[in-house]
Amino acid sequence: MQENSRLRIAIQKSGRLSKDSIALLESIGVKLRIHDQSLIAFSTNLPIDLLRVRDDDIPGLIFDGVVDLGIVGENVLEENELERKSKNENADFIMLKKLDFGGCRLSLALPENSEYKGVESFKNLRIATSYPQLLKRFMEENNIPYKTCMLTGSVEVAPSANLADGICDLVSSGATLKANGLKEVMVIYKSKACIIQRKESLVSHKQELIDKLLIRINGVMQARESKYIMLHAPIEKLEKITALLPGVEKPTILPLENDKARVALHMVSQENLFWETMEALKKEGASAILVLPIEKMLS
């Protein structure tokens, strides 16, 4: 297959991960032209094509070198990796970045009226799941014999339909489990979205673009975790006020025009400034205290 000159990125076609992936790309300056039913979207300002596919297909597209980058949940990635390796098939990829969205957990659940005494409670039970490889690894690590009921959807109805004794499924709030008379008893895997790259080396202009995008992504993620703090402080209380500020970095101190007794303090913090701290700052004489979100950062 001929090498495409444009960077090809695979993302989930629909759902929450799709929206978050598009929002991330747009936040780093990738302008996209997307039509709802189209499987391919194009960037209008960068040489990037976006392939919108089923999330289960993304790892394989990376393993096989069909696309250059993929944004996918760690749970889907590792399930596909384990499946490939069980068949001695290629499952090579490069993990570029774990992202700050798409969080979920893979959990074991039982009917609410079941007695649970630890993982041993699953011994010899039939467990319905869409993640047989992750379940198998966990059960083997804990030496628990079990049987699998493989389902690709509606896993939570398996016990009430007498298809299985329990389930292993993704959980976010737990509301779906409760609605189906189930209780979450153990988390076996925690997942977030991540960016992966195909293992084969890329032409230089593609790799340079990926490196640039990663720098921007790091900046956006760092900005989300940071706050810009500004305040005015009396010089005589400067040491006490500085000690109250969160983080390890020292603030920038600027003189105030027409006020020789006070200075302005500016700083970026990756820790929250709680109300109690703001009240303590005010008690020490600080004023005009502002805590602002940061949209973009380059460190």
Swiss-Prot record:
| E.C. no | 2.4.2.17
Answer whether the UniProt record assigns the keyword Glycosyltransferase to this protein: yes
The superkingdom of the source organism is Bacteria
Pathway membership: Amino-acid biosynthesis; L-histidine biosynthesis; L-histidine from 5-phospho-alpha-D-ribose 1-diphosphate: step 1/9
Q: Which GO terms describe its molecular function?
A: ATP binding; ATP phosphoribosyltransferase activity; magnesium ion binding
Q: Which GO terms describe its biological process?
A: L-histidine biosynthetic process
Q: What class of enzyme is it?
A: transferase
| NCBIfam families attached to this UniProt entry | hisG, HisG_C-term
Role played: Catalyzes the condensation of ATP and 5-phosphoribose 1-diphosphate to form N'-(5'-phosphoribosyl)-ATP (PR-ATP). Has a crucial role in the pathway because the rate of histidine biosynthesis seems to be controlled primarily by regulation of HisG enzymatic activity.
Give the similarity note.
Answer: Belongs to the ATP phosphoribosyltransferase family. Long subfamily.
**Protein name, per record:** ATP phosphoribosyltransferase
Where does this protein come from, organism-wise?
Campylobacter lari (strain RM2100 / D67 / ATCC BAA-1060)
